[in-house]
């Protein structure tokens, strides 16, 4: 039961961060490209790499994994919004933006997981 509370706490924090980041990015760049979703996915991927690597080199408590890995990062990142925004770009005929959104999300997020892991592993 404790882990459920940690997931809920982390999820509420992650959801608020996602909302604030998305609003900030729309104010900064407009809404022609989903920069907010891209940024939260990049941040979340980096942090997931850090959490994973920390778990490989030391003991990460189940509560921290629930709070950060499942709750915070689960609510911060969003595959469903990425998918919907990409489909909307395709439906509006913005094929290049849709392809760019797919490529950036996949490539940058995988790279950020790697970068997060390497940051931890290089400090050992």
From Swiss-Prot:
Tagged with keyword Cell division: no
Regulation: Na(+) is not transported, but it plays an essential structural role and its presence is essential for fluoride channel function.
NCBIfam families, alphabetized: crcB (TIGR00494)
Alphabetical keyword list: Cell inner membrane, Cell membrane, Ion channel, Ion transport, Membrane, Metal-binding, Sodium, Transmembrane, Transmembrane helix, Transport
Binding site for Na(+): 74, 77
Entry's transmembrane regions: 4-24, 35-55, 70-90, 95-115
Protein name, entry field: Fluoride-specific ion channel FluC
One Gene Ontology cellular component annotation held by this UniProt entry: plasma membrane
Reactions that this protein is recorded to catalyse: fluoride(in) = fluoride(out)
Membrane association type: Multi-pass membrane protein
Localization in the cell: Cell inner membrane
Assigned protein family: Belongs to the fluoride channel Fluc/FEX (TC 1.A.43) family.
Keyword Transmembrane helix listed: yes
Any one GO biological process: cellular detoxification of fluoride
One matching Pfam family: CRCB
GO MF terms held by the record: fluoride channel activity; metal ion binding
Source domain of life: Bacteria
Its biological purpose: Fluoride-specific ion channel. Important for reducing fluoride concentration in the cell, thus reducing its toxicity.
